[in-house]
Amino acid sequence: MPFFLVQRSFAEQLDLSRDEITVLEGANLDAGIRWIEAFLTADRMQSYCLFEAPSADVIRAASAAAGMPIDSIVEVSSLLGRVAAPAG
C-alpha cells in the first residue's frame, strides 16, 4: 500500500486531547488508513503526517469527515528509516 505525506495548516494552535486523537485514529483505521507518524511545527499551526493508505482520495475523504484541513498530499515512494542519533 502506498505512503502519503499530508501537510495541514490550522487557524488556531492545534491542541488535541488523547481522546480526540483516539477518535481520529479509529476513523482512519475504519477508512483503511494507517497513521504512521505526525509532526507539529513549533507554533502548533501546521502538521505533517505520514500515512499508509489505499489512495490520496481516501485520505481526503476521511479528513473531510473528521473536519481536518489538508494543504497538500504527496505520495512518497519509500521510507528511508529513522535517524538513530543526532549528527555531530
Annotate the PLM regions.
Residues N28-D30, P54-L79:
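An amphipathic, aromatic/His-enriched active-site/gating alpha helix that lines ligand/cofactor pockets
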Residues M1-D30, R34-I36, T41-M45, S78-G88:
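Short S/T/G/P-rich N-terminal loop/turn motif that feeds into the first structured element of a domain
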Residues S9, L50-E52:
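Short hydrophobic/aromatic beta-strand micro-patches
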